[in-house]
Amino acid sequence: MTSEVIEDEKQFYSKAKTYWKQIPPTVDGMLGGYGHISNIDLNSSRKFLQRFLREGPNKTGTSCALDCGAGIGRITKRLLLPLFRVVDMVDVTEDFLAKAKTYLGEEGKRVRNYFCCGLQDFSPEPGSYDVIWIQWVIGHLTDQHLAEFLRRCKRGLRPNGIIVIKDNMAQEGVILDDVDSSVCRDLEVVRRIIRTAGLSLLAEERQENLPDEIYHVYSFALR
C-alpha cells in the first residue's frame, strides 16, 4: 500500500513535479538514461496492442488514443500516431509538451490536445478514446488516486476501447524511490488496484529483452 511508504501526499506530488522539471526533454531523459531500450519497448508494445486492433467483431477502434504521462511524445510518435487517426497527450511537465511540438514533426499535426496536468487531477472526456495508454507513470500516483484515475479512464473509453498500463513491477510490496518521488508496486498490488477500479484484465505480458539490472516490466490490457 502506498499509504505505508508515502508520508506526505502533497510533498510526494510536488517533489515529482520538481524532479521532472530538471530532466532534459530527450528520449534518454524520458527513459532515465535508458534511451537505448526504446526500440525494444515500442516493438513489443506494438505487438501487444495490435492483437486488439485486429480481432473480429469486438475489435478496438483506431480513431483516437490518449497518451498519459506522455513526456515529449516518444510513444505518441512511434506507437500511437502510426495506428490512430488522432492522439491526445497529457503530461505534468509543460516543457516536455512544448518540446513535443517539434519532436513529433509533421505527423504532430494529428495531436489534437496537449493537456498539461497531473493524472491525479485529469479526467478524460467520457466516451472519447479507443485506447488510453498509461506507461511508466502509475508510480507517480497514490493507490487511491490510481484507482480513481482508472475509473475515470474507463468512462473515457469508446465502445470496445481498452486501457493499457505498462510499467515496472517490484518483486514484493511497494518500494518508494525518493529521487523521482515515485513508487514501484508488485504485480499483486497492481492487479488489486485494477480490480478496485472495476476493470477486467484482458491480457497481461512481461516485456522481454530488457537489461537485467532494471525492474521487470509488464503490460496489462483492461476494460
Curated annotation (Swiss-Prot):
Q: Name one GO cellular component term.
A: nucleus
Modified sites of kind N-acetylthreonine: T2
The record's section on SUPFAM superfamilies has: S-adenosyl-L-methionine-dependent methyltransferases (SSF53335)
- What's its EC? 2.1.1.244
Q: Which reaction does this enzyme catalyse, per its entry?
A: N-terminal L-alanyl-L-prolyl-L-lysyl-[protein] + 3 S-adenosyl-L-methionine = N-terminal N,N,N-trimethyl-L-alanyl-L-prolyl-L-lysyl-[protein] + 3 S-adenosyl-L-homocysteine + 3 H(+); N-terminal L-seryl-L-prolyl-L-lysyl-[protein] + 3 S-adenosyl-L-methionine = N-terminal N,N,N-trimethyl-L-seryl-L-prolyl-L-lysyl-[protein] + 3 S-adenosyl-L-homocysteine + 3 H(+); N-terminal L-prolyl-L-prolyl-L-lysyl-[protein] + 2 S-adenosyl-L-methionine = N-terminal N,N-dimethyl-L-prolyl-L-prolyl-L-lysyl-[protein] + 2 S-adenosyl-L-homocysteine + 2 H(+)
Residues with N-acetylmethionine modification: M1
GO terms assigned for molecular function: histone methyltransferase activity; N-terminal protein N-methyltransferase activity; protein methyltransferase activity
Tell me which InterPro entries the record gives: MeTrfase_NTM1 (IPR008576), SAM-dependent_MTases_sf (IPR029063)
Binding, S-adenosyl-L-methionine: G69, R74, D91, V92, T93, L119, Q120, Q135
Q: What keywords were assigned to this record? A: Acetylation, Methyltransferase, Nucleus, S-adenosyl-L-methionine, Transferase
Q: Name one GO biological process term.
A: chromosome segregation
Pfam families found in the cross-reference section: Methyltransf_PK
Name where it's found. Nucleus
Q: Which CDD domains match?
A: AdoMet_MTases
Q: What does this protein do?
A: Distributive alpha-N-methyltransferase that methylates the N-terminus of target proteins containing the N-terminal motif [Ala/Gly/Pro/Ser]-Pro-Lys when the initiator Met is cleaved. Specifically catalyzes mono-, di- or tri-methylation of the exposed alpha-amino group of the Ala, Gly or Ser residue in the [Ala/Gly/Ser]-Pro-Lys motif and mono- or di-methylation of Pro in the Pro-Pro-Lys motif. Some of the substrates may be primed by NTMT2-mediated monomethylation. Catalyzes the trimethylation of the N-terminal Gly in CENPA (after removal of Met-1).
Q: Which family does it belong to?
A: Belongs to the methyltransferase superfamily. NTM1 family.
Q: Mind telling me which PANTHER family this protein's record contains?
A: AD-003 - RELATED, N-TERMINAL XAA-PRO-LYS N-METHYLTRANSFERASE 1
The molecule here is called: N-terminal Xaa-Pro-Lys N-methyltransferase 1
